[in-house]
């Protein structure tokens, strides 16, 4: 599906049998359980503070699943089109007119055919959120069209509030003065033809704007609001059909009211609207103008009949459209805030002296002037509402006013935006409101009469222009939510008081079985297992209350969508509202420009009245919560959101200019950045040069506020932290990635951020700078993703480099000081660690690194080579120095012109000071090729020209580099690197002493990755004040700029900011050379490159460890392994990303004994863990095998250590680990009490000693973790306990008796998880009989549940289930005793014939495939591979591979049905009734002979025809009546009397057809008239190029025709098949041809089934192995292996729901079974697996709910996101004892997990276990290495 499901747009359902355009039918029930329908309204609007692409892994993964559900299947989805695509995301099946703009095709996945499913499922689970209750009956009705903000060229100046949605799905009335055509009017839809007349040629301009729309509360999976996509609102403005269509559409309109002659709308339009200037200005105010000043009509306007049959006083008195709550315009809050009222006063004001509001207003321009665009007001919509009263009255027959009693204390849209005063709530009764669309066929004048009515009070008010459609107006009235528990009240739905009512239907789970039912799509719902007032539902949240004293901004308000994935509402208000969601961070303040929008914010954080979030991931002031930590007080929160200041930051572009101001309450002195940095940011941008004409387009460079930038210091978080806070994914209150508030703290450690703390000496220096304006009181918050230094901060990605204060420790992974413990810095302690790309340093002379070790020996062995660094001064800049290498023989540079000065203006300030690590932002990785490289032909610099493909940016002029070339002659030693070049060479990876190679690292070289280049870290470091003197060659201007921008010297490594650094001259001051040792990305010479191994005085490189003699143990990116330590062992381990640099505690331990080394300090690496049992690991995923509990993310021990590196291990279960066993950690694994860990609670031991036997207490309540709760066994056996309450985790709960509402469903009981639930099992053993469940209610998981569910991918139906699932991919076949009578209608079908998208694989009642008695095939998209005895084929898209002999009706699939039979016809089976598939159906035939098929009378009308004559597109193959297909029909016998009139004619019959290309007339003499096709006809004697060859012309290869069927015997069959691309192929005796659509024959025998040779689209026969049947999209037969079809037996279809098979297959989505006893999902990534006691071990599904077998190693159940069992291998689940990549497993081989002794690619297992990454992780004991490094020497200090 090209594009994604945009906001308010429903997914396409190919099986909506109720009609895809009949919105009256589809939308007639806008009531309960809209959450039950999956992917219907995945709202794609991002929160205002969320960059779309800044999301993390899980959010990206899930949001792509939810918002672009099938783009990986159907189209070459361009990610860039996510914000600009105007294509409709509806799958056009020919019924819908192709719609430009944001067309809404209202379909329902939950098909009405499955009403019986919901009836049998409605009341069976009281504890589950009955999301599938009536889910099949209730279609999602949020039919809103996002009308673009710029339907006119004037709208570029219009302040239209972003996200205004006009729902014109039912009715699109053109603006009579403007006639912009939103999509297609109803008349067009009903008539299926455009309005345009023949002579019209409208220019249609489709403009797409992305606005920070208000996030809608919409139904996503299980109610997950997916608010991370910008809404793409598209308007197709048709500007030339107005003057010709206004009169035809509205014949009664007078021309004086409409200037129909104006083709474009301009301000000179003469409209007699008599509107005052204030009335014509569109105002977004807090007044309830949308409900006020409306005229009240006593009786509804009748549409077509005089007296409305419903105009009784009783009905009118309770009309839901005319009677509404009265609002007080003077009071902006709801009347009777704490009292439930259903005020029967009309929503309309009385028809009184109040001035009628205008029906249209002028939109204001951005500058405040009136725009020429007129916009219909809500008054026009109210007219339609009044008109529709008669339509809506009948629904009140069973109306109970008590059901609408709701207080106004809560509302659906709890917008926290300061502009959003609490609007008036509209109570809608909990009744069904019919969706009324004015049907021009049946109501041709009703709307026109309505529009032509003038207001009663004001004749001259002007023409009423109802822009809002009737549907949106009706859906404006929200019905109240369902009743909560006793202390909770029903929320009224708040609607935005804007002309475009943001309407989202808050559905109510219409359940009577449980009072705690959850409506996942509504803003608040009861928890499924408690009746407390805290709405702790997984996907819904408790709405936030808005304080009324908020600051008014113009940002669109984001209501707190407290759902699973939604972040909290962005509120400019400091009274941050509460919202609870799984990923809900703290109330993020409005980041005005975090997304492209026109909103601005001037919020102030002076009051600091912030309320606490109240769901399981956020907590009160003293609790540790998952994503937020409120106060300075207790709790270590990994995912803390630092909401201490409310700061408004503008997103900083590459030019680095921040235009925002901030009022911060932080008292910490922000670390000022020297002007040098700002100028380098602004002026070094390659496109900021005057040569490019862009110099003056942005903010002036010397903005005083910018001198005081507090740089962000962390990948995910930046400053703004007052307390010492340890956060995992901490984000500042200003959510944008590159945003930081201006606050710093003395010490704080977070996993992904380290709040920068200004070093006092550095701060004093920089404030003492000459031209510095650091005294600015309001530091501008900057969004530059750079890293500043802090004194003591430990963060994962926060490379807080230490400042000149050498005592400060910054344990960040990117830190590069020798004293720091950065992840990407290398340890400086000798023999204490090795890095990813360099192995153990065993001697003082060899530090081998595969990516180059810039050691000082001339024989350093590196992958990219390393240069001799003995005479080289280390380039002090960690940026890419991309200018050519300086050479001694370089001529003096020509004097710089002014253009050059401007061009290198940012560089000039840096050139003298680069030795101190000055970093320039001039280069992005894209390098503009505008430099003056004059010595490009030289051997050293020749290969770094700007012409190279690597985008080598010219640093500046080549001559400037050559000015700074060291005068000393470089030592030309031969390098021994893998790609090393000769000393003078300029090879790609070669390194000469003077550099010049791409990856070379010359001492002063200018190679791409050499040490003062690509990723210099000196951007935000302060430069020494003695740097001001520059070389004499420098101009005074440069020297002046340098003084202005010099900053104090420090060392910092930065990986994010690509900058260019100039090489210093040799004769610079010594202070610049001695104080800086910066790290380049891919290695410098003596400085530590990314892959190089620096000298002892150098800072750590990214991937290598420090050489010998170092004093600090800073490990590199992938960890330093345990090194034999002959030097002093540091007590503090290095913090490597994937490995733990576990320093040996023994001073004499060798590298071979690293597996027995005991360290006293755990490593703080991301995935690493310490390798010893006595040590603790605080790594992200690592845990140890020791009795202690590491305080890692998934660890199980607590490591308390102070800044002095003194570590104290606390072996308690209340650790700070992510999955610690106490409820103190949100990720903790529950012990006796169920904690709500992020990844569920795994089976953890109560004892202090971790044993292999997991003995955990029985948790009565599962944790509501992110991925569900892993079941806590009640016994010591990890496979015998089932919790009684499922968790509502993200991916559901693993097996428990009660289904959870997890994202992936729950185990054992059908849950409503995203991927369904794994099968329920009645036995206590997980590995034993898991198919004996008698669960009768399927789960509604995304991928279905084991029980038939309505999951996305169907459900794996368990035995004896009576209701199949309606999952996306259908449900997999139930086991051998299945008595399923109703097929599921999953996307890919189900085992029972379902209406799945891709059909279903029909079940077998026995273990064999040939005895199935399923009677109804599925109507999947690709048909269903129905079972053997099915009597009705499926109507899949590609037909159904219906079963054999007893099929009576073929399917009507897209490509027909391959209905098998006793005959072997080219298209499949002999069924009594052919199907009407797209490509026709294989004709039914009663004989088994190919040459003598006696087809039945009824022929299918497939696209390509059918075997029987049909009216297919390409005709049909033969029968008595030819088809009229596009390409005609390949008729066979001479008895055919009527040829087809296909596009390409028909293959012969007695009268030839008149196809486009004529008809290939038959060979019989009875054909008297050849066809008069475009290319003529193939007369019997002639062969037209396009005709279908006859038996007389067998060798003819027509493009479109095909050989007809043999008329007599197989011997007369043509020996050569035609290779026609489109036609139906002939049955030939030779090999198959490769026709595009046709199906060539493959056999020589007449009785064999012809195959679809290589036909991508045709529907194959049962014995073929063709792509389309076993076709990628067709429903394959039992022996085929199609990608998409649902295979029957041994096939390996990727998508279809697999058939129970005797052999295992590898389906992408389906689950093929591997045994006859019980089906299993063999390797289906997405399908929900079947629970099997025998073959479930071979299943490895990424997404499906896992099987309950303990031996199964499925990724997704034991799934990466599912709730894995205790012993399964789950990438993402956190099972207690499973080898899980991301789990917390201690002793398992896991790719990313950090088991203590496992061969982990990224783990830090230093043991002798085989390590896939070899030296990357902890090196093996033998010290694996790629080579030897030369002797390491100290870099020569130059003077």
Curated annotation (Swiss-Prot):
| Residue ranges, compositional bias (Polar residues) | 1-27, 35-54, 91-101, 344-354, 616-628, 1093-1106, 1293-1310, 1507-1521, 1676-1708
Which intervals of the chain are annotated as region Disordered? 1-54, 78-150, 325-367, 480-568, 589-636, 657-705, 739-810, 818-837, 846-1106, 1129-1839
Give a GO biological-process term. Answer: telomere tethering at nuclear periphery
Cysteine-cysteine disulfides:
none
Q: Which GO terms describe its molecular function?
A: nuclear localization sequence binding; RNA binding; structural constituent of nuclear pore
Superkingdom as given in the UniProt entry:
Eukaryota
List, as start-end ranges, the regions of compositional bias called Low complexity: 80-90, 102-148, 329-343, 495-568, 589-607, 658-671, 739-760, 774-803, 827-837, 846-871, 1005-1021, 1046-1060, 1071-1092, 1129-1242, 1250-1292, 1311-1384, 1397-1498, 1522-1673, 1712-1810
Pfam family name, one: Nucleoporin_FG
* One GO cellular component term: nuclear pore cytoplasmic filaments
Checking InterPro entries in the record gives: Nucleoporin_FG_rpt
Bias (Basic and acidic residues) occurs at 761-773, 1061-1070
Q: Where is the composition biased (Acidic residues)?
A: 896-923, 944-958
Q: Protein name, please? A: Nuclear pore complex protein DDB_G0274915
At the highest ranks, the source species' classification is: Eukaryota, Amoebozoa, Evosea, Eumycetozoa, Dictyostelia
